Design a protein with these regions (language model features):
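Carbohydrate-associated surface elements
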Residues: 18
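Acidic donor-binding loop of glycosyltransferase active sites
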Residues: 115-129, 142
Length: 222
């Protein structure tokens, strides 16, 4: 950005998007029923079908018999045929009874949804500029599994709350999910590390103070 604007790097301040932490109260222990979660628009670009495929693979491996899939997010009339296609896929695999699909949640419903997840994944097909849903999952104390593209590497590496996989590796997501689900205690510890990182670096209350400091810094130094 500094190069594009032809200004000194010392003149640039990084100020990420943030969230209000009110209501985010992560569980201290792993959920009784292991649950893989998705919270984003229910559309191909966000990779919902890729997550459904990964879930089917995990179930068919025989290592995750009690694993459930919880899907939530915005859904428009345009998205309905795609979502119906995922339902058919899950029905054919004999797994539809272990899957919940809850479109268009309000904030309180979203908070409760996130609290009950063991691991969170949105395998977006394009590089996300940020991905607020990742910050929300981490704030809820849920470890994340994401493609190594866009803003995801920076968020995951800063928060230490999840795993990245090569988006060109068809098995990368499934293997990363499997490794987290195999060790619930380590997964919960990873999620709590992510929660603490979000509280420190992405809370709106702290970001507001940081923004004021960034604005006033040139004035005070002149």
């Amino acid at each position: 950005m500094a190069e594009r604007l032809k200004i000194s790097e010392d003149s640039v301040r990084h100020h990420p998007n943030g969230i209000t932490l009110d209501g985010f109260s992560p569980r201290r222990e792993a959920p009784e029923i292991p649950t893989l979660g998705y919270l984003a628009r229910l559309c191909p670009l966000k990779g919902l079908d890729l997550l459904v495929d990964a879930y089917v693979e995990l179930k068919q491996s025989g290592k995750h018999e009690s694993l459930r899939l919880a899907i939530a997010g915005g859904m428009t009339e345009e998205d309905e045929p795609f979502v119906d296609e995922q339902r058919r896929k899950l029905t054919q695999a004999g797994l539809i009874d272990q899957v919940s699909i809850a479109p268009n949640l309000d904030r309180d419903q979203k908070l409760e949804f996130l609290r009950n997840l063991s691991v969170f994944s949105v395998p977006a097909r394009y590089p996300e500029a940020f991905g607020l849903y990742v910050i929300e999952a981490l704030a809820a104390g849920v470890p994340v599994v994401l493609p190594e593209s866009g803003a995801f590497p920076e968020i995951v590496e800063n928060a230490q709350g999840g795993k990245l996989y090569d988006p060109n590796d068809s098995m990368g997501q499934t293997q990363s999910l499997d490794s987290i689900l195999q060790d619930p205690s380590a997964a919960k510890a990873m999620g709590m590390t992510g929660h603490e990182a979000v509280a420190e670096g992405y809370a709106n209350e702290k970001l507001a103070l940081s923004l004021v400091d960034h604005i006033l810094e040139p004035i005070h130094s002149s």
